[in-house]
């Protein structure tokens, strides 16, 4: 296998140390993914440079121009503290004409909207859980095709953010 120069983008809070020795499992859990990616790539013989990115693109540009990575491994899930800006980092990498891992900006934007992404996936005959979108502050009538219990989720929140026990609906009255 050819040795590559790989730039790994991550949130600065998740920059891993060179070794896990001396850390508790709870401490390791914070940056475990980033540590595993960096250490696995290094163990495979690649030249790896981790870079913490939060609010500025200049460090990314400087690393691309100075380190000249053959690929950027993008672990960023937000930029400038907003998960909705993740596609901008991928756009920047495209503009810099550097290969990168993960989805392209358009795919990241489409995936952000749960209703649209589920509709697109369903259209391609890929099974997805039944869902319906209800307008806010209006009376809700559950369609018969949706069996209880249900989980109420935000259309725009990332992953399971905002979901709690109160999000579980077990009766039509709730």
Regions found by a protein language model. Give the residues of each.
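Conserved N-proximal alpha/beta basic substrate-recognition cap immediately N-terminal to
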Residues: 14, 25-133, 158
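Short secondary-structure boundary micro-motifs
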Residues: 23, 82, 151-153
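A short, flexible N-terminal coil/short beta segment enriched in small residues
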Residues: 1-27
């Amino acid at each position: 296998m050819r040795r590559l120069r790989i730039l790994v983008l991550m949130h600065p809070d998740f920059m891993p140390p060179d070794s896990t020795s001396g850390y508790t499992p709870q401490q390791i859990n914070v940056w475990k993914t980033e540590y595993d990616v960096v250490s696995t790539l290094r163990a495979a013989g690649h030249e790896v440079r981790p870079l913490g990115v939060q609010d500025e693109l200049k460090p990314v540009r400087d690393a691309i121009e100075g380190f000249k990575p053959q690929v950027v491994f993008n672990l960023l899930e937000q930029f400038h503290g907003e998960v909705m800006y993740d596609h901008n980092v991928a756009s920047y990498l495209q503009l810099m004409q550097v290969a990168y891992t993960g989805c392209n900006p358009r795919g990241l934007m489409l995936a952000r909207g749960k209703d649209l992404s589920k509709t697109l996936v369903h259209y391609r005959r890929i099974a997805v859980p039944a869902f319906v979108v209800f307008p806010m502050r209006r009376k809700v009538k559950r369609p018969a095709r949706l069996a209880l219990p249900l989980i109420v989720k935000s259309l725009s929140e990332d992953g399971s953010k905002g979901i709690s026990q109160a999000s579980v609906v077990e009766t039509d009255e709730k």
